[in-house]
Structure formats: structure tokens, C-alpha cells
């Protein structure tokens, strides 16, 4: 009886708590999750048979080989990695090329987080083009950036940024300065609530940047805490950069918005005999000057709907009178009362007297030796300096790659600027007509499936392009590659800086060789 009772209780205990569906593999078709052969996949276009292939050496960055050739021809990548102050001591530490190359691949692909490095982790073809052994993990990339001493990293990165653009400064050029804000989320060092027009009240970092106008090349970037967005925090690094340049390579002028139109910045420019063009805030004295000029008359046409006139003013805190340019244009403003009293029928057909004309004013302080119309045009063209901010933040990663400490944020900001400069120059070499943003150039000049094969000691890459302009892309790349290969094979006696100079001369031949006629404006500020 005891044995029977034990058997019945065991059966009851097994049925009281059913196991549900049990092991999922037991109800799936046999070996379906580990199928050795092709998997049938039904789609709207019919059935496809899919099979994984982890052994074929392939890359989604098929055209990376041409960019690697560009960096090698000028010695940019080798010198950059060789000088990196990592200070590795362990024999198991990754190479400089592995760490920097992993980040470079991620940046080139438009990633914004260290975790995105995993997307290129098992590329079996592209890493070798940059002398890499492997793509390191996200943790390794983030952790190894901590090996840098902040000052050593600053000197190393500024040196190589300078080597990228220094030869171009032998031509007359204009320098644009501006500040952008990077919103951060969390408890990062320097995450302070300061000026943040897009997300007020959010902590941020301030990026003080310096540009070669029109060429959209970044001279340098300084990352500061969120409350240090004022120009006074970014100008010391700029003066350090300018003072290190030979006099003949200094800018023909400096342009900045109203955040830079202070007495201190003007005095610093005047001390160095560098002309400036700064926008001024419309204080009471400036508004009185505008009223005086309106009564006085004598406005001249400056193009694009602008009119201009010049005068002199000495604001409170200024040491002397300075020349100012006042520009105005008509703008239409809505009349709320007219909109409120309008009939629905007139509203539907847009026949409303709801707009009145008034003037919008821009006041500029300048020591540049140009007329009113030229100065208004120069400042209007400064709007082009806003475009690189949008590109670097939304297409290159300036809005990401955030770490707890601000030093690594600074290193990655400069690294992104370096990769951006190299890629921009490469894109101009392939197509010198104009600057094109990464959202356009990546699909054209980086995408494509590359399949690598090796035979008889030769490595061959077969590239398949899916771009609609593939024929044009192939022709331009063939021309650029032939030029670079000629430098590598026939100019072996030249040093890396000399070869890089030849590359820059090829890219900017329309700026450097045929000088602008009948104008005194800086060559690299117009075009």
C-alpha cells in the first residue's frame, strides 16, 4: 500500500505543475536552428534559399582601398599612428594601428557611440589596408584612450591636424571662429547647464572651433565644460595657434558672430595686425547709430537684398572709436490683428493684408580694407561656417562618443576632426568641383561589396557597386588612384610632407594656381 501511495503522489506532483511548452527545440522542425544547408525563406518575391558564409573574406566598405591609398601616398596614417603617445608596456597590448584604426573605421561609417565599433568588428578585409591586425572591441578602444596623457595627446593631435592643412595657409585665407554645443546625458565631467539653445536646461559641453573658410577644414577644436561657451574660453587656444604660424601664413581676416565682438578680441587682433569682421550686439548706442544712419541716408546696394552704410562708434568699454558697417534688408512681419479679423474665405486663398515691411539690421565692426558691399558679402558668406557644425555633429560623431572624463571627449573630438579633414580632402581629390557632405560621399566613395582573393602572391579585391552613378564613380576613382599610385612609385625620393604637398596642390589647383582676378578678397574666403 505504501508503494502504491508513493506512485500515486508522484504522478499527482508531476501533473500539478505542467511544464508548459517544454523545450522550444522539441517542437521546431529537426535541426531547424542549426541547419547545415540553405534555409528556405519565403518572401513576396518568391522563395529564397539562404546560407551563412563566415569564411569568405568580404567587406561592406569595398572602396576603402582607395582611401587607404590616399592616406598612404601622403604618409598621413603611418605618421599619425607612429607618433601616438599611448605608452603601452604590456607585450599583449594592441598596436597603435589597431586602436586608432578601429575608431577610424567607426568614425568613417558615421557611428556616434563606442558600442558601434562592434558593427565593423569582424571585417576580414579592410583592417589590413591600414596596417591593422584586427578591430579591437569597444571596451578596448574606450579603455586604451585612457592611456593618453592629456597634454601629450593635445600636442600629438594638434601637430597632425596642422600637417594636414599647413601648406594651404601660404595662400590668402579667412579664418572663421564659432562655438557649438553638445548635449550630454548623465554625470560626465564638465556636464554643466549653460548655453544650450536646442535643449535648454540640459547639461552640455562647449566645442570651440576654428575653420579655414570655404574649404571647410577644421584647424582645431577645444572641448570645454558647458558653462564655458563664451568666446573668452576659446580664444586663448586660437591665439596660441596663430602665434605659432609664420607671419606670411596668418589669416587675412577673422570672422565671428556677436559672441566675438568684444573689445578684448578686437585689441588682440589689432595687436597682431590681423584684420577682423565681428558682428556687434545691438545695444542702445548701436540702435541710436542705426536711427542716425536712417535719417542721414546714403545706403549702397550690397546684393541679395541687402543695403549697407558705414560709420564710426565708440561703445562703453571701448578704448577708441572703430569703423562699423550697418547692413539692412526688408523683411515681412505678420500683423496679428489683421489675421484675427480676416474672413475664412480670404484666409483660404491667402489673400490677406497680414504682412508689413520693416528692416532687419546687422551691425559689423571691421578693420578690413574693403568697401561696404564687400564686407557685407564677406559676413553673409560666413553662414557657410554653420554647415560643418551640422555635418560633424549629425554625420561624423561630434554629438556622441561621450565618456565620463572630458579628456577622452577632447581626444575623440580632435580624432573626428582629423578623419573628417582627411575624408573631405579625399572627396575633393576625386571630385574637386565642390565640398560634398558625408551623407553623399559615403555611399559614393566608401560603399560597395568587396571580395578579396589571393593567388600567386597577389591580393585582389573585386568590388561590386550598387550606386546609380557607378560608371562616373569608377572613372573618377581610376583617375585619382592613378595619380596617387604615380606618387608612390615614381616619387620615392620625396619625403611624406613633400608628397602631401603635391596632393594638396592637385586638390586645390583652382584655388592656388589661378588667382582671383580684379578683387582684393582672400583667395580661400571666396570661390
Q: What residue spans do the PLM features occupy?
A:
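Short amphipathic alpha-helical "interface-anchor" segments enriched in bulky aromatics
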Residues: 117, 181, 372-415, 419-426
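Short secondary-structure boundary/capping segments
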Residues: 189-194, 268-274, 291-297
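Domain-level cores of phosphate- or acyl-group-handling catalytic modules
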Residues: 228-285
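Basic, amphipathic alpha-helical segments enriched in Lys/Arg and hydrophobic/aromatic residues
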Residues: 399-462
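Dynamic "connector" segments at or just before major functional cores
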Residues: 2-202, 208-247, 450-527
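Short, conserved catalytic/metal-binding motifs centered on acidic residues
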Residues: 70, 102-103, 117, 137, ...
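An anionic, glycine-rich sequence signature occurring as long contiguous blocks
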Residues: 8, 12-14, 19, 37-50, ...
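Structural motif
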Residues: 58, 89-98, 354-355, 403-413
Amino acid at each position: 500500500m505504501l508503494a502504491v501511495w508513493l506512485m500515486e503522489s508522484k504522478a499527482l506532483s508531476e501533473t500539478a505543475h505542467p511544464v508548459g511548452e517544454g523545450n522550444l527545440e522539441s517542437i521546431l522542425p529537426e535541426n531547424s536552428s542549426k541547419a547545415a544547408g540553405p534555409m528556405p525563406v519565403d518572401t513576396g518575391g518568391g522563395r529564397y534559399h539562404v546560407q551563412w558564409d563566415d569564411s569568405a573574406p568580404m567587406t561592406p566598405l569595398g572602396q576603402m582601398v582607395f582611401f587607404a591609398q590616399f592616406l598612404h601616398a601622403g604618409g598621413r596614417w603611418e605618421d599619425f599612428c607612429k607618433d601616438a603617445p599611448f605608452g603601452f608596456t604590456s607585450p599583449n597590448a594592441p598596436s597603435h594601428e589597431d586602436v586608432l584604426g578601429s575608431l577610424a573605421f567607426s568614425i568613417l561609417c558615421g557611428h556616434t557611440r563606442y558600442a558601434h565599433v562592434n558593427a565593423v568588428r569582424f571585417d576580414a578585409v579592410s583592417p589590413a589596408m591600414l596596417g591593422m591586425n584586427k578591430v579591437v572591441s569597444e571596451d578596448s578602444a574606450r579603455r586604451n584612450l585612457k592611456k593618453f596623457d592629456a597634454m601629450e595627446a593635445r600636442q600629438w593631435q594638434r601637430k597632425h591636424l596642422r600637417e594636414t592643412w599647413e601648406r594651404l595657409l601660404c595662400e590668402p585665407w579667412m579664418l572663421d571662429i564659432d562655438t557649438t554645443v553638445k548635449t550630454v546625458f548623465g554625470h560626465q565631467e564638465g556636464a554643466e547647464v549653460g548655453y544650450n539653445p536646442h535643449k535648454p536646461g540640459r547639461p552640455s559641453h562647449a566645442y570651440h572651433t576654428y575653420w579655414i573658410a570655404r574649404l571647410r577644414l577644421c584647424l582645431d577644436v577645444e572641448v570645454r565644460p558647458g558653462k564655458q561657451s563664451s568666446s573668452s574660453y576659446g580664444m586663448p587656444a586660437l591665439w596660441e595657434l596663430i602665434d605659432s604660424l609664420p607671419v606670411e601664413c596668418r589669416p587675412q581676416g577673422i570672422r565671428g558672430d556677436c559672441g566675438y565682438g568684444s573689445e578684448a578680441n578686437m585689441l588682440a587682433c589689432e595687436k597682431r595686425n590681423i584684420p577682423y569682421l565681428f558682428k556687434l550686439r545691438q545695444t542702445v548706442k548701436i540702435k541710436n547709430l542705426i536711427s542716425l544712419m536712417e535719417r542721414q541716408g546714403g545706403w549702397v546696394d550690397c546684393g541679395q537684398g541687402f543695403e549697407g552704410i558705414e560709420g564710426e562708434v565708440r561703445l562703453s568699454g571701448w578704448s577708441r572709436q572703430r569703423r562699423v558697417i550697418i547692413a539692412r534688408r526688408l523683411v515681412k512681419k505678420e500683423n496679428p490683428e489683421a489675421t484675427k479679423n480676416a474672413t475664412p474665405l480670404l484666409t483660404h486663398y491667402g489673400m490677406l493684408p497680414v504682412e508689413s515691411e520693416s528692416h532687419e539690421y546687422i551691425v559689423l565692426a571691421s578693420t578690413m580694407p574693403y568697401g561696404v558691399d564687400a564686407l557685407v558679402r564677406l559676413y553673409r558668406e560666413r553662414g557657410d561656417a554653420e554647415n560643418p557644425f551640422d555635418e560633424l555633429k549629425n554625420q561624423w560623431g561630434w554629438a556622441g562618443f561621450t565618456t565620463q572624463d572630458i579628456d577622452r571627449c577632447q581626444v575623440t573630438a580632435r580624432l573626428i576632426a582629423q578623419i573628417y579633414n582627411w575624408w573631405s580632402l579625399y572627396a575633393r581629390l576625386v571630385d574637386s568641383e565642390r565640398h560634398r557632405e558625408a551623407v553623399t560621399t559615403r555611399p559614393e566613395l566608401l560603399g560597395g561589396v568587396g571580395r578579396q582573393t589571393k593567388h600567386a602572391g597577389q591580393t585582389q579585391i573585386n568590388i561590386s557597386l550598387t550606386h546609380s552613378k557607378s560608371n562616373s564613380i569608377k572613372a573618377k576613382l581610376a583617375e585619382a588612384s592613378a595619380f596617387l599610385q604615380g606618387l608612390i612609385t615614381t616619387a620615392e625620393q620625396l619625403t611624406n610632407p613633400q608628397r602631401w604637398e603635391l596632393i594638396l596642390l592637385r586638390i586645390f589647383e583652382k584655388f592656388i594656381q589661378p588667382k582671383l582676378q580684379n578683387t582684393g578678397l582672400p583667395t580661400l574666403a571666396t570661390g
